[in-house]
């Protein structure tokens, strides 16, 4: 219940900020926002991946989103690590036996997150 309320509060903050946000990575208190339309991820695998609107939280509270390879349209899971603008990848990605996709995996700090339009809001 506390987790739900904190995410709801974070969403309320994002809603209030949406009209005034002009630049990515603006920080308000302990929440930070990121303009997803401008974000790209440079991995150590096959080049640059563009994020799509597929966001989830792991059971541990880790935050990740799915990125798509522009060339072969493979989906990759990218975690938000450390500071919200830092992304980490695994040296040896594993393959999802059900979908056949390779997923990037690593340990990350815990963040709560919410999506508002094209903005990702992360709250510690």
Swiss-Prot record:
Tissue expression from the record: Expressed by the venom duct.
The record's account of how the chain is modified after translation: Contain 2 disulfide bonds.
Cellular-component GO terms for this entry: extracellular region
Residues of the signal peptide: 1-20
Keyword Secreted found: yes
Propeptide: 21-99
Intracellular or extracellular location(s): Secreted
Coiled-coil features, chain-numbered ranges: none
Key words of the record: Cleavage on pair of basic residues, Disulfide bond, Neurotoxin, Secreted, Signal, Toxin
MF GO annotations: toxin activity
Domain commentary: The cysteine framework is XIV (C-C-C-C).
Known function: Probable neurotoxin.
Designated name of the protein: Conotoxin Im14.2
Organism: Conus imperialis
């Amino acid at each position: 219940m506390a987790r739900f309320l904190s995410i709801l509060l974070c969403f309320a903050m994002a809603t209030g900020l949406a009209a005034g946000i002009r630049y990515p990575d603006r920080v308000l208190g302990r929440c930070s926002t990121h303009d997803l339309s401008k974000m790209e991820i440079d991995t150590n695998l096959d080049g640059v991946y563009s994020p799509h609107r597929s966001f989830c939280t792991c059971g541990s509270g880790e935050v990740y989103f799915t990125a798509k390879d522009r060339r072969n349209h493979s989906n990759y899971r990218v975690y938000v690590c450390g500071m919200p603008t830092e992304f980490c990848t695994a040296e040896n990605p594993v393959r999802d036996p059900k979908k056949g996709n390779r997923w990037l995996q690593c340990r990350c700090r815990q963040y709560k997150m919410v999506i508002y339009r094209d903005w990702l809001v992360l709250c510690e």
